[in-house]
Amino acid sequence: MDKDIKAIIILLATQAMINMGEIQDPITHEAKDDLDGAAVFIELLDILESKTQGNLTTEEEAFLIEVRENLDQVYNKKISAG
């Protein structure tokens, strides 16, 4: 797998998880509760997926889809919890 694309996916997913409070902010060491912020990073992953369609290896595409699905589950759970 190309480390560059994986690094971008991980970077965006990590920021989404930080904004959803699933990972502590590495600077403040506090859990955030910013679902709007998380949505921005999730949307960026959607853009990445659409712009790279047909140009990713099978492994890269599967990784991106898995990360997106996991983020969707966490995001929807947070939204439902209110």
Whereabouts are the PLM-identified features?
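Acidic, glycine-enriched active-site microenvironments
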Residues: 52
